[in-house]
Amino acid sequence: MDYDKLSKDILQLVGGEENVQRVIHCMTRLRFNLHDNAKADRSQLEQLPGVMGTNISGEQFQIIIGNDVPKVYQAIVRHSNLSDEKSAGSSSQKKNVLSAVFDVISGVFTPILPAIAGAGMIKGLVALAVTFGWMAEKSQVHVILTAVGDGAFYFLPLLLAMSAARKFGSNPYVAAAIAAAILHPDLTALLGAGKPISFIGLPVTAATYSSTVIPILLSIWIASYVEKWIDRFTHASLKLIVVPTFTLLIVVPLTLITVGPLGAILGEYLSSGVNYLFDHAGLVAMILLAGTFSLIIMTGMHYAFVPIMINNIAQNGHDYLLPAMFLANMGQAGASFAVFLRSRNKKFKSLALTTSITALMGITEPAMYGVNMRLKKPFAAALIGGAAGGAFYGMTGVASYIVGGNAGLPSIPVFIGPTFIYAMIGLVIAFAAGTAAAYLLGFEDVPSDGSQQPAVHEGSREIIHSPIKGEVKALSEVKDGVFSAGVMGKGFAIEPEEGEVVSPVRGSVTTIFKTKHAIGITSDQGAEILIHIGLDTVKLEGQWFTAHIKEGDKVAPGDPLVSFDLEQIKAAGYDVITPVIVTNTDQYSFSPVKEIGKVQPKEALLALS
């Protein structure tokens, strides 16, 4: 893949660098905050090689890339003045409260996920080593590795402070100093001593801030306003000293007196609410969550669960949300594996197997967008697989006990605890159910490549022949959303090699546009066919086109319809790819006779039945 070219194309199609406030990436997606989402050309973005799809979550514009997203992101940064350091604070775009919340969660937690994932995996591996007797508990090695695993979680407020400051547009190092203050060992000891505490006569509520999420987020949000307010009234020559000094003096005590305790209470209630739901309706809750989590991933809103997961483990020592994400991923992997088993297209079989393995590793977008959603029924099967695993988890009370990386096999140590065996069984159930459901539901296979054409079905009502010499392509490759999205109907496209268009069927000419760039034919069997020569060629107003027919003429396969000057039109900057559409698509089922490769006029391409 040419990452440099792809990055330049993406920047152009999102409205140019000037339309980008900020760009970050997660494991599979580029996440843009754009000044105006309407300027992004979604249809053309989705046609780019390497782009699996686009999505808008809240106000965030997302481009789904897959495993190569870090390389594409690096290329974007290399070819622009953008980075994840750019503040979104300058946006003039109005956001509703829900959109703003999801945008903040994504922007704050995405940058720190590698640290949390790495530390969580180390915690899991240490627990595994102790369980199997490979490491003595309290040994020097154990103490050091435990510190490595615990460090990111104990000092989580510090990581969040820096990330949140970048998101809120304040100084990340002052934010880190705020977090460091509330985590100071002497202050922690004072807060944990159980004695009344006050600051200049104001009571300080005892609370523990290590490993917490909400208190520091509220604190840095307030700090961003305090810092800007002080900056506004401070002379430029004094800002370096005055702004950070007074920000710390105001925000740290405010955090200890009001913000911190409020955040701690909110976190406790949030955790208690999740636990109550799973304690009293665990079976139903887990079935619904595991069965629909893939839909949540599609919206990109799954990152909204990250702070809840972290908070649950910090408050209670376990979490029920991450297991649901695991099951959804296993369902996607199983459905894609079923496609591998059933498909007769060698290339697509290979893709299905590869994406199934990737989903098992915790990266589901390639399987979801590249295989299961493309074939539709396997995606429904994946949801069934997740729900089946959710039923088992709900009955057995499976939980995760640490925060790990992706919800895939490498992160299995997150389950080390009382329900570990049940967790493994549930993963197998989700994968097997996804596989079985997809296999039994079946799907319309991607036609096999190759020079040998499949036989036309005996029950076919109509055969559509090629109207032009050239190379046949899928409609999805047409750089016009109306055609590529199938809005006009199903069909195929041809990249012409000569400027002669002939009739693809026996029937009557129903329409010939005055610009002669488009012809409508109704076959004797009732198929309504549109041949559209090039894209935007209506602007030529008939120049370089010659019609050989008129409306009402009877035609047979191979009869001349229109001649056009291929080279002149290309030289004028027009794309000459020619969609051939069956506009009354809903009346037929389609069987491609030849889907790719060179074609001659009158060569059978599509069977309608």
Swiss-Prot record:
EC number: 2.7.1.-
Signal peptide span: none
Key word Disulfide bond present: no
GO biological process assignments: phosphoenolpyruvate-dependent sugar phosphotransferase system; trehalose transport
Ranges for domain PTS EIIC type-1: 103-459
UniProt KW keywords: Cell membrane, Kinase, Membrane, Phosphotransferase system, Sugar transport, Transferase, Transmembrane, Transmembrane helix, Transport
Residues at the active site: C26 (phosphocysteine intermediate), H532 (tele-phosphohistidine intermediate)
Domain PTS EIIB type-1 residue range list: 1-86
Gene Ontology MF: a single term: kinase activity
Keyword flag Nucleotidyltransferase: no
Highest taxon above the source species: Bacteria
Annotated TM spans: 112-132, 141-161, 174-194, 202-222, 246-266, 281-301, 321-341, 351-371, 379-399, 412-432
GO cellular component: plasma membrane
Every PTS EIIA type-1 domain range: 480-584
Function: The phosphoenolpyruvate-dependent sugar phosphotransferase system (sugar PTS), a major carbohydrate active -transport system, catalyzes the phosphorylation of incoming sugar substrates concomitantly with their translocation across the cell membrane. This system is involved in beta-glucoside transport.
Entries under NCBIfam families matching the protein: PTBA, PTS-II-ABC-beta
Entry remark concerning the domains of this protein: The EIIB domain is phosphorylated by phospho-EIIA on a cysteinyl or histidyl residue, depending on the transported sugar. Then, it transfers the phosphoryl group to the sugar substrate concomitantly with the sugar uptake processed by the EIIC domain. The EIIC domain forms the PTS system translocation channel and contains the specific substrate-binding site.
Protein name: PTS system beta-glucoside-specific EIIBCA component
Organism: Bacillus subtilis (strain 168)
Source taxonomy: Bacteria, Bacillati, Bacillota, Bacilli, Bacillales
